[in-house]
Amino acid sequence: YDAKKMVIWPISSGLLMVLLSVGIYYWDWHFKIGILSGNIWVYMLLSIAGTVLTQVALDNISKYFRSGMLKDRFNLENESFEQSTECVSNPYSVNIPMRFYYQGKFRHGWINIINPFRGTWVVGTPGSGKTFSVIEPYIRQHSSKGFSMVVYDYKFPTLATKLYYHYRKNKEQKKIPEGCKFRIINFVNVEYSCRVNPIQQKYIGNLAAAQETAETLIESLQKGQKGSGGGSDQFFQTSATNFLAACIYFFVNYGKKPYDEYGHELDAEYSEDPETHHKRLTGRVYAKGCLGQMDKLVEPAYWKGQYSDMPHVLSFLNHSYEEIFEVLVTDPEVYPLLGPFKTAFDNKAMEQLEGMIGTLRVQTSRLATKEAYWVFSGDDFDLKVSDPKNPSYLLIANDPEMESIIGALNALILNRLVTRVNSGQGKNVPVSIIVDELPTLYFHKIDRLIGTARSNKVAVTLGFQELPQLEADYGKVGKDKIITTVGNVISGSARSKDTLDWLSGDIFGKVVQLKKGITIDRDRTSINLNENMDSLVPASKISDMASGWICGQTARDFTVTKTGKNDSMNIQEAEEFKTSKFFCKTNFNMDEIKAEEEDYKNYPLPIYYNFKSTDAKERILYNNFNRIDQEVKDMIKKIQTEFGKSEKKESSPTKKQ
């Protein structure tokens, strides 16, 4: 549409001709053509031509307004907005290149996640591109910036190959922390797995930590539906938690010995209880072979129980109630937790006892696999992956075919890990915890980690598909805690009404939009312009996003407010008031990514235990499984021999009173 040619020139020429024709009409030329004088003929020609040109120009104006109607049927112009075009980077940031539409141009920009320690969650339907667009850039950039990494791989080895590739590449370029190791936990292909023991005193220092661990395991087996059945279910679940905590803490303390920081055993001093004849620690620890020499007193780095690991606990739970109680009551620290159970057992109230701990035994029996026994019966590394002296990358693997069982085992590891990394008074290596497909793993009290771990440089990134999916596995309260604690919100295409309404209404909100109304009739054309509040990004637009398109909002950091003379401020231009929202298409260098993926084959995942053959692997795993069961049986017999029933009754707090 050329306004000059179609409107300005025709209407100017037409009006000029009409005015000129009026002047010529009164100008007598003193000659005639036919019956009319010459000026009349010129007048008629100019007036007709001028009128036609004027009508053509006015018609073109009408065509312009008519052509503008329904031109932006989906209101795309009003819903486009200016976004960040500058890459704002810092030692912890994640910067995702993107392109966005604004005022007729498809512009280049950046999603600047400048504070990942405030947490990030990514939501989107399968195939929407959330892993490619967000999860993988987090792995690439945090690895290159010297973070220690914890990545949950639901479909091992999808993310494992990427994480190991960047570990090796950045290690070659000396970008990762010095001495950083690569670890994998895998309960299916155990040859690819390191061994770890989350049930030991350095992770469980008191009974409260044991209860936290027990609660994590039970809720992960129940997919986090804590107390969903009312008061009675809450009672039985609490009972199961207390009983499992008592078992865990007993094994943490049973036969514990001190060790120095290099793993060398030290000598602990014991005294014998005159009533129970049970040996009690005096608190004095000596160098090895120097027991009783006061000048050889040392401070142990940690303590470790003789059978302090999860396989021994699981095996112990499969024994009879009589054997279990005979063993547990010998530890006065766990005795208070056993009161209701011991009373029910002594009164032969087996139905009540089964209600309190029978379900626990059924659920935990599913975890007693030879692979789980193998992984949990060793201790190859410390779960404090952010320790400056011993940092590491940890890949936690799952398998869709064994999701619930492996998810519970992984939840146990993750629970003790986050306790370790969320300590250190800010002196830790920054750590990035990335959990894609969050509903397949129960992340116990994740909201507390996000809310309290900023000072310890813990960045948490969570990926899931829809809010109802998250609510199904974490409960409504758990879902609300997660989505309201996280500061950085990113979404791909979504379908659920809950997800869409929350994003459109609570994240993007409404903005002032200019609406144009046109009325055309025979007499006139009227134009109405109105300003009103409407959704910046409506729900239908989010649901219609193609793969690779993402939207959301990044968390803001504190900035100094800049004002002019007399505290004047142009709020429209002030940096502090610019939006951190985005609606865009990611813009990666696909050639670089393709070259990276082709290079994966040169960095195969490490094998930590070479079993030589499948048969040899099965024999080793079964032998380890049987060894643990036999050790538990031997321990029970030993305790039964050392403490007769009469002595146990005398040693109980009730009898003492």
PLM segments and residue spans:
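A short, compositionally biased
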Residues: N90-I96, G179, S543-C551
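Basic- and hydrophobic-enriched, low-structure N-terminal and domain-boundary segments
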Residues: Y1-S128, F132-P137, K145, D521, ...
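Short, flexible active-site loops
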Residues: L15-M17, I396, I433, V486
